[in-house]
């Protein structure tokens, strides 16, 4: 479903990604862990070309990701993304935030888009907030709207870039629960997160990044109980000590 081959990314002289080779089959849930500045978010953002790459290729569902144009827009429509910030339109109701993409990009009729939106808002547990505006919702609720909005496009892949890091601690679990239920339903997911419990519980596979490279790639049990590199051991020692 996702194939990255020899991907290199620079910000001026700084190499953010080094020779990334990664294949994610359909239905797999991949959690990307690593210290700050290790390239996790950059990796996630290159998958739908929010960040350009200097070398290498990226394929989504067998199609080469172009640099720009209509073909890129088509592929992007199949890749849902949820960010640290919710990026909801403040002047639109919750329901209208969710229906906008399907109507504009998928050319869905308003009645059908409304039906899809209400089903998804139900699924993420906030159908009763459909007519409210983003400012009237908590951070956790807004992030769940952002997930519903991404799902409304019926994506083949969902990317999550630290979706809980801007939330108050008591709101984190409500978002992780939605993500875990998506994982159980077989959605192909790449999640950048610091939530170790989620990684252990919901991931099929853990990637550990350091200095722009993937240095470990294993199942969660192996990674958390028997990490292979000193860098990963050090990282887990610091994180799990708290």
Swiss-Prot record:
Q: Which reaction does it catalyse?
A: a polar amino acid(out) + ATP + H2O = a polar amino acid(in) + ADP + phosphate + H(+); L-glutamate(out) + ATP + H2O = L-glutamate(in) + ADP + phosphate + H(+)
Tell me what topology the record assigns in the membrane.
Peripheral membrane protein
Q: Boundaries of each ABC transporter domain copy?
A: 2-236
List localization entries: Cell membrane
What CDD domains does the annotation carry? Answer: ABC_HisP_GlnQ
Any one GO CC term of this protein is: plasma membrane
Q: What class of enzyme is it?
A: translocase
Note whether Transport occurs among the keywords.
yes
- Reading the lineage from the top rank, the first entry is Bacteria
One Pfam family hit: ABC_tran
The EC number(s) attached to this protein equal: 7.4.2.1
Q: Which family does it belong to?
A: Belongs to the ABC transporter superfamily.
> Can you state the subunit structure given in the record?
The complex is composed of two ATP-binding proteins (GluA), two transmembrane proteins (GluC and GluD) and a solute-binding protein (GluB).
Described purpose of this protein according to its UniProt entry: Part of the ABC transporter complex GluABCD involved in glutamate uptake. Probably responsible for energy coupling to the transport system.
Annotated protein name in UniProt: Glutamate transport ATP-binding protein GluA
Supply the source organism for this entry: Corynebacterium efficiens (strain DSM 44549 / YS-314 / AJ 12310 / JCM 11189 / NBRC 100395)
